[in-house]
């Protein structure tokens, strides 16, 4: 049987007030190839890395909420997913919309108001490779964990699993797709910071978190949380010159 791929983070977008300046920043920091799309295309600027289309940059005034990074999850049927979002305590921000003959999307807010994309796309390449320059992890925090887990399981198609570290159950659920944990939702305060609504956090792979943090500063960005060690590597939380927050992590 074909591998069930619903529930994996399949697309990211950066909503920015200056696409060209943002392109220069991320091109230098992560080695991306960023090109303006042709007029009439659904994307404004295309981001490629290691031969794969991984993201787009869009104008800030097109953002469904605050500008910054947004993630979308693969679903089997976008209308069913949108209905599930309403049923599980969230709400639909953008109704299911066809983009091409094989692609449709909707935007929904989870019970805490964090906006997430729901994408039905027959041509999606599958989960992002686990390597430098790629988005390698995604998570969000919830004021009430169990309703949030239900929302992401039913609306975003996550095959959820309670995270266990050293035989201790954590206040955190992961989405396990193809045998690999690809994203998660945790209780507010899980990372030591009470921040709800938070917003979806995207982690990009780097070879050296400390060197990457220095480069962020040199390029006009901000280091929000200095590099630190955690269970799976070393990471740093940063913002680009326009304030879009993300994380850089070794792997």
Language model features with spans:
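Core segments of cupin and vicinal oxygen chelate
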Residues: 4-6, 10-52, 87, 95-103, ...
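Active-site/binding-pocket entry motifs
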Residues: 53, 63, 181-182, 191
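Ligand-binding pocket scaffold of soluble enzyme catalytic domains
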Residues: 13, 22, 37, 60, ...
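Vicinal oxygen chelate
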Residues: 1-5, 8-17, 45-46, 60-84, 88-136, 140, 161-178, ...
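Internal amphipathic alpha-helical segments of the cytochrome P450 catalytic fold
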Residues: 23, 54, 82, 93, ...
């Amino acid at each position: 049987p074909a591998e069930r791929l619903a529930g994996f983070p399949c697309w990211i977008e950066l909503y920015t007030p200056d696409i060209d300046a943002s392109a220069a920043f991320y091109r230098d920091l992560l080695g991306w190839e960023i090109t303006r799309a042709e007029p009439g295309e659904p994307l404004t600027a295309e981001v490629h890395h290691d031969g794969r289309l991984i993201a787009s940059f869009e104008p800030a005034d097109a953002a469904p909420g605050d500008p910054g990074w947004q993630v979308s999850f693969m679903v089997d049927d976008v209308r069913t997913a949108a209905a599930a979002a309403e049923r599980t305590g969230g709400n639909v921000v953008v109704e299911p919309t066809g983009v091409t003959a094989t692609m449709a999307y909707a935007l929904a807010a989870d019970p805490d108001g964090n906006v997430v994309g729901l994408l039905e796309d027959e041509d999606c390449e599958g989960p992002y490779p686990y390597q430098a320059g790629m988005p390698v992890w995604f998570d969000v925090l919830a004021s009430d964990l169990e309703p949030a887990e239900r929302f992401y399981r039913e609306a975003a198609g996550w095959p959820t699993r309670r995270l266990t570290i050293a035989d201790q159950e954590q206040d955190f659920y992961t989405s396990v797709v193809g045998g690999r944990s690809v994203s998660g939702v945790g209780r507010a305060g899980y990372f030591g910071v009470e921040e709800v609504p938070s917003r979806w956090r995207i982690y990009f792979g780097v070879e050296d978190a400390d060197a990457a943090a220095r480069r962020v500063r040199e390029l006009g960005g901000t280091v929000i949380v200095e590099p630190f060690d955690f269970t799976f590597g070393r990471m740093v939380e940063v913002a680009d010159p326009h304030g879009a927050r993300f994380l850089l992590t070794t792997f």
